[in-house]
C-alpha cells in the first residue's frame, strides 16, 4: 500500500497537537490533519514534535526543556497503517541512537528477520531486503551469496553477522564491524564435498574476485577484506549456485598450490609494485657523496666571512698580534678543508670504484684537525699549518713530493740566512750597509722565480696522475707562503733603513726590540686567557643562578602542595564533624518521633477501650494467648539490640541467598516467606493482592500472614507497629519496588536503591509539598523512579522547566535545563537530596545549598545513605539459608514442568483461576510485572 492510498481512520490523531521542525513531506501533514490532528505554532503547546533532523536546536529544546516526544514522519505513516497510535520510543530522529545512519540489508534470515528488523529500526536505523546504493551494512550469517560477493567490491558497505546487531543492542553502543565479519566465523563442513569445492574454486579463480582464506590464513587481521575496484549489481544467484556455495571445505586441503593461492586471498593484500620500488630508491641514493658530511666542524670558522678574508690577507710580520695570526691560520685551515671537500666530491663522482682513498683522506684530515689547532700558537711568523701541508703532500705522486721537499729546503735556507743577518746587525751595527745589500739581493732573487721552481711547475703540469684540485691547492699554499715572506722582508728592509739613517739614536732601542715583541705576544695571550676565564666564570654564575631559581620554584611548589593538603584535611574534618552532628540530630529526631508515635498509639488504644467496653472479655482472652509470644520476643530482644547498635553496614557485607548454592532462575525466591502490610489500597483490592501472591509463588516464594514465620516484610512506611515489630525481630523490610527489581533480575539481591526501602514518614504526610521539581540528565528507569519519589514526598513533578520550578535535580552539571536554572537562580541539586528526605533527613529541606548536594556525576545517584538506613540493612548481613531437601524438590518440580511442556504442548494456555474482568492496573501488572508502576497508577487514579 503506497502513501497515496492510505486511509486515515476518523479521529485517529484527535488528541495530537503536532509541531513541525524543519522540512518534512506535506503528505505527512495532510495525514495528521485528516485524522483530526491540530498543528500549533509553538513547541511548548504541542504534544508531539515531528522532525527529520535530530540535531536541530529546536529538537533538543523540545525534548530537554519541555519533555516532549520527538518522532520521525514514519511514525505517522505506520500509525495510519496500523490503525492506532504507535509508541513513540522507537521513532526518535536524534543522532545519538545506536543504529543512527545505518541502512541494513537482511537476506537469508528467514527465522530471525523480524527480530533483527525490529532491533535496527527501534534504535534509529533502516532495513530493506533489496541490495542497492542506499545500503551501508550487509547482514549475512555466512561468507557466501551474490550480495556478499557484490558487497566485497565496495569499500563503503560493511559486512557483518547478526551477532553484531545483538551485541550492539546489549552494550547500547555500536560495536566495531571488523570484528563481526562473516569470514571470521569458524564452522565445519563434510570432507566428501571437497571435490566440488575444488571444482568451484578452479572455476572462480579466473573471475574478478579471489578465493577465501585457508585455515592458516584465516587467523590474520580482517582489515583488508574488500576489493577497491567498483562493480555493478549482480543478478540473484540460482538454487544450484546457492547449493554449490554451501558445499565447500577449506579445512582439510593443505596442498602447496592451495596455500600459495590462499596467501593472497584478496587483491587488497597484494603489495603493488610501484610502492615497493619507491621504498628501495633511498637505499640506492646512499653512496660516497655523503661522506663529507662526517667531516668534523672547523674550529674557529664561526666568524663572518669578511673577518676570515681580512685575517687571511693580513701580513704575518714580527709586530702582528696573535689574534690576527690566529685568524690567518684559521682562514688557511678553512680553505684547505674546502679544497679537500671538493677533492672528495670530485673523486666520488669520477671514481666510484675507489671509495677507500676518499675515506682515508677524510679520516686523516679529521684526525689532523686537533693538531693544527694546538700548533697554531707555535707556527712563528709564517702562519702556515705544516701538518696540513704534509697530509696533502702524502696524497701526491713521488716525483711531486721530491720537488716540494726541495722547494721547502730552499725556503728554510733563506730563512736561516735572514736570521743570521738580523743577528749580525744586532751584534755589529757597522755592518748594516753590507747586510742591507745582501738582503736586497735576496729579495730580488725571491721576486725572480728560480729555474727550479719553473721546472717544478712544468713538471707538475706534466703529471697525468695528479688531480687538478690538489694541484690548485698546492699552488695556493705556495703563493700564500711567498707572499707572507715578501711582506716580512719588506718590513725588515724598512727597519734596516731606519737604523742606517739614524744609527746613533735608535741603537739603545734596537737591541730589546725583538724581546718586546715576544713580550707583547705573551701579554696578548695572557689577556685572551683571562677573557676566556672571565667568560667561563660568567657562565658558571649564570648556571648557579638558574639552579637556585629552580630550587626556589620547587620549594614554592612543595609549600603550595602542603598548604593544599592541609586545607583538604581541614575540609574533610569539617565535613566529618557536620556528618556526625547530622547523625546525632537524626537519632534524636527518630527517638522523639518514636516516642510521639507510641503516645499516639496509647491514646488511640485508650479511646478504643472506652468505646468498646463490651469487647473486654474477648480482648483479655486475646492478650492471654499473646503472652507466650511476647515472652519469646523478650528473650530475643537482647540479641537484636546488639545488632541494631552495630556500626553502619556497607553494601559489600550484605547477602541474599547463601553464596555456595546454585539456585535456578525459575525459583530464585526459594526460602523466602513474604508478609504484606501497610499497603491499604492494595489490600483493599483483592484482585491485585491475589496477583502479587501468584507471582511470588511462581518464582519459588511463599506468602504468609503471620509475621513470626516470614523472612521478608513488604511495607511502604516506617511508621507502623508491624514495621517496628519486624525490625526488632530482624526481618528484612523492603518495598514492592524491590520485589519488582529482583523479578527483573531473576536473583534475590540486597536493596541498593532508595525506593527499595520504606520511607520514614506516614503515607499521608507531604514534606516536599511546597516544591515543584524538574529533572535533567536521567533517562528510562531512573527518570521514572525520580517521578515516583517526588510523588511520595508530596512534591509536584514537571517534565519541563520554567521560572515557577523550585528545584532542579541534575545528574551532571550540563544541559539546557541546567543553564536555564542557573540563569533563573533555581537551586540545582543531585538525587541524594530527595533520597535523604524520603529516609528521614528533613534537614535537607533547609540545607538545599549544602556542598554534598552539589556533587554531581555520582556512580549510583539513587543509592541510599548508609548512615540513615543501617538499621534496615542489618538483617541482610545474614544470608537466607536453604535446606538441601527444599532445593532438590524445587529442581524436581522444574524438571516435571519442562517434561510436561515437551510431551504435550497446550494449544491454548488454560486459566489458572476464575477471576473477574481485569482492570487497567491489573492488566499493566500482568504484562509488565512492575509493582512500582502499578503503585503509581493507583495513587494517581485516587488523586
From Swiss-Prot:
| One GO CC annotation | nucleus
Indicate yes or no for the key word Flavoprotein. Answer: no
For this protein, the record's SMART domains field holds: BRCT
Biased composition of type Low complexity is found at 220-230, 620-635
Query: What Pfam families does its record include?
Result: BRCT, PTCB-BRCT
User: Which GO BP annotation is one of this protein's?
Assistant: DNA repair
* Record localization: Nucleus
Q: Where is this region: Disordered?
A: 190-281, 400-507, 620-641
- BRCT domain mapped to chain residues: 8-93, 94-182, 664-756, 763-851
Task: Map motif Nuclear localization signal onto the chain.
Answer: 730-747
Q: Main localisation, per the record?
A: nucleus
Q: Which UniProt keywords apply?
A: DNA damage, DNA repair, Nucleus, Repeat, Transcription, Transcription regulation
Q: Where is the composition biased (Basic and acidic residues)?
A: 198-214
How it assembles, according to the record, is: Interacts with smad2 via its last three BRCT domain-containing regions in an activin signal-dependent manner.
The entry's function note states:
Involved in DNA damage response. May function as transcriptional cofactor in TGF beta signaling. Accentuates Smad2-dependent transcription.
Q: What is this protein called?
A: PAX-interacting protein 1
Which species does the entry assign this protein to?
A: Danio rerio (Zebrafish)
Q: Which gene encodes it?
A: paxip1
Amino acid at each position: 500500500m503506497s502513501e497515496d492510498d492510505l486511509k486515515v481512520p476518523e479521529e485517529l490523531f484527535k488528541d495530537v497537537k503536532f509541531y513541525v521542525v524543519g522540512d518534512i513531506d506535506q503528505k505527512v501533514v495532510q495525514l495528521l490533519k485528516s485524522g483530526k490532528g491540530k498543528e500549533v505554532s509553538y513547541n511548548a503547546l504541542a504534544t508531539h514534535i515531528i522532525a527529520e533532523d535530530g540535531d536541530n536546536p529546536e529538537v533538543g529544546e523540545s525534548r530537554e526543556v519541555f519533555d516532549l516526544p520527538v518522532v520521525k514522519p514514519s511514525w505517522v505513516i505506520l500509525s495510519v497503517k496500523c490503525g492506532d497510535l504507535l509508541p513513540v520510543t522507537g521513532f526518535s530522529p536524534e543522532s545519538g541512537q545506536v543504529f543512527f545512519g545505518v541502512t541494513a540489508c537482511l537476506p537469508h534470515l528467514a527465522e530471525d528477520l523480524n527480530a533483527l528488523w525490529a532491533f535496527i529500526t527501534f534504535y534509529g536505523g533502516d532495513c530493506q531486503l533489496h541490495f542497492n546504493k542506499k545500503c551501508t551494512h550487509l547482514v549475512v550469517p555466512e561468507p557466501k551469496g551474490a550480495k556478499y560477493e557484490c558487497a566485497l567490491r565496495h569499500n563503503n558497505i560493511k559486512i557483518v553477522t547478526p551477532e553484531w546487531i545483538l551485541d550492539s543492542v546489549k552494550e547500547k553502543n555500536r560495536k566495531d564491524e571488523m570484528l563481526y565479519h562473516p569470514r571470521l566465523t569458524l564452522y565445519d563442513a563434510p570432507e566428501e564435498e571437497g571435490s566440488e569445492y575444488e571444482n568451484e574454486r578452479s572455476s572462480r579463480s579466473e573471475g574478478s574476485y579471489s578465493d577465501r582464506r585457508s585455515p592458516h590464513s584465516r587467523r590474520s587481521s580482517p582489515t583488508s577484506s574488500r576489493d577497491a575496484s567498483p562493480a555493478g549489481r549482480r543478478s540473484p544467484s540460482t538454487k544450484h549456485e546457492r547449493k554449490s556455495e554451501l558445499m565447500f571445505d577449506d579445512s582439510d586441503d593443505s596442498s602447496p598450490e592451495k596455500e600459495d593461492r590462499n596467501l593472497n586471498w584478496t587483491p587488497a593484500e597484494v603489495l603493488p609494485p610501484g610502492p615497493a620500488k619507491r621504498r628501495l630508491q633511498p637505499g640506492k641514493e646512499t653512496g660516497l657523496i655523503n661522506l663529507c658530511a662526517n667531516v668534523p666542524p672547523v674550529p674557529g670558522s664561526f666568524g663572518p666571512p669578511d673577518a676570515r678574508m681580512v685575517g687571511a690577507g693580513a701580513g704575518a710580520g714580527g709586530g702582528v698580534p696573535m689574534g690576527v695570526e690566529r685568524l690567518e691560520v684559521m682562514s688557511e685551515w678553512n680553505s684547505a678543508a674546502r679544497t679537500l671537500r671538493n677533492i672528495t666530491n670530485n673523486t666520488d663522482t669520477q671514481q666510484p670504484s675507489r671509495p677507500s682513498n676518499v675515506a682515508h683522506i677524510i679520516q686523516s684530515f679529521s684526525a689532523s684537525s686537533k693538531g693544527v689547532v694546538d700548533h697554531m700558537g707555535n707556527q712563528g711568523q709564517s702562519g702556515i699549518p705544516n701538518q696540513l701541508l704534509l697530509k696533502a703532500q702524502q696524497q701526491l705522486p713521488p716525483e711531486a713530493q721530491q720537488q716540494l721537499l726541495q722547494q721547502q729546503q730552499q725556503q728554510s735556507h733563506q730563512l736561516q740566512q735572514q736570521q743570521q743577518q738580523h743577528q749580525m746587525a744586532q751584534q755589529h751595527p757597522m755592518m748594516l750597509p753590507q747586510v742591507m745589500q745582501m738582503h736586497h739581493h735576496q729579495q730580488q732573487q725571491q721576486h725572480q722565480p728560480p729555474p727550479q721552481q719553473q721546472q717544478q711547475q712544468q713538471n707538475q703540469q706534466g703529471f697525468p696522475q695528479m688531480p687538478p684540485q690538489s694541484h690548485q691547492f698546492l699552488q695556493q699554499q705556495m703563493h700564500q707562503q711567498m707572499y707572507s715572506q715578501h711582506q716580512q722582508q719588506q718590513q725588515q728592509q724598512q727597519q734596516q733603513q731606519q737604523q742606517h739613517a739614524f744609527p746613533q739614536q735608535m741603537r739603545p732601542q734596537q737591541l730589546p726590540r725583538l724581546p718586546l715583541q715576544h713580550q707583547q705576544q705573551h701579554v696578548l695571550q695572557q689577556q685572551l686567557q683571562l677573557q676566556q676565564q672571565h667568560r667561563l666564570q660568567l657562565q658558571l654564575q649564570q648556571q648557579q643562578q638558574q639552579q637556585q631559581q629552580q630550587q626556589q620554584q620547587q620549594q614554592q611548589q612543595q609549600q603550595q602542595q602542603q598548604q593544599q593538603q592541609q586545607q583538604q584535611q581541614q575540609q574533610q574534618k569539617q565535613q566529618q564533624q557536620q556528618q556526625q552532628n547530622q547523625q546525632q540530630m537524626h537519632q534524636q529526631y527518630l527517638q522523639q518521633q518514636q516516642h510521639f508515635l507510641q503516645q499516639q498509639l496509647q491514646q488511640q488504644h485508650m479511646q478504643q477501650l472506652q468505646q468498646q467496653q463490651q469487647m473486654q472479655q474477648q480482648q483479655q482472652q486475646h492478650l492471654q494467648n499473646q503472652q507466650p509470644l511476647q515472652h519469646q520476643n523478650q528473650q530475643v530482644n537482647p540479641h537484636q539490640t546488639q545488632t541494631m547498635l552495630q556500626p553502619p553496614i556497607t553494601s559489600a557485607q550484605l547477602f541474599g541467598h547463601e553464596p555456595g548454592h546454585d539456585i535456578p532462575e525459575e525459583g530464585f525466591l526459594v526460602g523466602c516467606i513474604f508478609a504484606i502490610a501497610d499497603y491499604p489500597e492494595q489490600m483493599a483490592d483483592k484482585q491485585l493482592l491475589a496477583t502479587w501472591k501468584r507471582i511470588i509463588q511462581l518464582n519459588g516464594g511463599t506468602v504468609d500472614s503471620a509475621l513470626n514465620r516470614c523472612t521478608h516484610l513488604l511495607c511502604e512506611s516506617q511508621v507502623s507497629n508491624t514495621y517496628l515489630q519486624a525490625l526488632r525481630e530482624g526481618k528484612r523490610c523492603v518495598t514492592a519496588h524491590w520485589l519488582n527489581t529482583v523479578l527483573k533480575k531473576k536473583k534475590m539481591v540486597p536493596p541498593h536503591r532508595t525506593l527499595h526501602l520504606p520511607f520514614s514518614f506516614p503515607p499521608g504526610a507531604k514534606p516536599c509539598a511546597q516544591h515543584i521539581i524538574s529533572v535533567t540528565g536521567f533517562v528510562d528507569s531512573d527518570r521514572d523512579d525520580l517521578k515516583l519519589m517526588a510523588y511520595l514526598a508530596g512534591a509536584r513533578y514537571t517534565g519541563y522547566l520554567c521560572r515557577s520550578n523550585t528545584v532542579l535535580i541534575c545528574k551532571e552539571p550540563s544541559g539546557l535545563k541546567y543553564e536555564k536554572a542557573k540563569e533563573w537562580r533555581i537551586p540545582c541539586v543531585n538525587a541524594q537530596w530527595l533520597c535523604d528526605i524520603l529516609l528521614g533527613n528533613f534537614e535537607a529541606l533547609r540545607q538545599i545549598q549544602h556542598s554534598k548536594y552539589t556533587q554531581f556525576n555520582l556512580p549510583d545517584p539513587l543509592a541510599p545513605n548508609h548512615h540513615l538506613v543501617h538499621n534496615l540493612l542489618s538483617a541482610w548481613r545474614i544470608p537466607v539459608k536453604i535446606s538441601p531437601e527444599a532445593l532438590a524438590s524445587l529442581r524436581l518440580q522444574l524438571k516435571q514442568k519442562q517434561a510436561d511442556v515437551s510431551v504435550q504442548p497446550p494449544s491454548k494456555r488454560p486459566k489458572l483461576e476464575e477471576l473477574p474482568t481485569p482492570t487497567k492496573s491489573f492488566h499493566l501488572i500482568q504484562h509488565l510485572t512492575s509493582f512500582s508502576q502499578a503503585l503509581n497508577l493507583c495513587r494517581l487514579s485516587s488523586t
